[in-house]
């Protein structure tokens, strides 16, 4: 039951509050929007979708820069590793070929020598070479493991590009 006194009090409070109210139409203080007699001011603001698109582009650029930085560091480390593995495999191949040729010569000399002492010394030397060749082959296998890991990373990148192709085919339909 709003008496005239209550209405008067409410009106005074509204007048007092008007001083702190901004009109949504003309963007001025001092009156309510429904009391506005001015024209609507045009305030240019980018749309929400434009702001979201801009934020998405920034995130994509950051991710691309991070991935490019990671691939650059991976390439640098791979470049450093490759020369080491190439030299180790070439040295292991040459040492393996030397050990096999020396073991053949020692085997032929042991067959020519009828002394037991000569055959023992040649067999011990061939076993020493075989152990060195096995260690070098293990180092070459570890380098081939690193090469296979780099090839698997390159194959995964080619697979990702092939993943992009099917949607293009779908768009052609």
UniProtKB/Swiss-Prot annotation:
Q: Which residues form a coiled coil?
A: none
Keywords, A to Z, come to:
Metal-binding, Zinc, Zinc-finger
Single GO molecular function: nucleic acid binding
| Chain intervals for the UniProt region annotation (Disordered) | 57-173
Question: Which InterPro entries does this UniProt record tie to the protein?
Answer: ZCCHC10 (IPR039715), Znf_CCHC_sf (IPR036875)
Biased composition of type Low complexity is found at 88-160
Zinc fingers (CCHC-type) by residue: 21-38
Q: Highest taxon of the source?
A: Eukaryota
- One Pfam match, given by its short name, reads zf-CCHC_3
Q: Which PANTHER family match?
A: ZCCHC10 PROTEIN (PTHR13491), ZINC FINGER CCHC DOMAIN-CONTAINING PROTEIN 10 (PTHR13491:SF0)
| Protein name as catalogued | Zinc finger CCHC domain-containing protein 10
Species per Swiss-Prot/TrEMBL record: Rattus norvegicus (Rat)
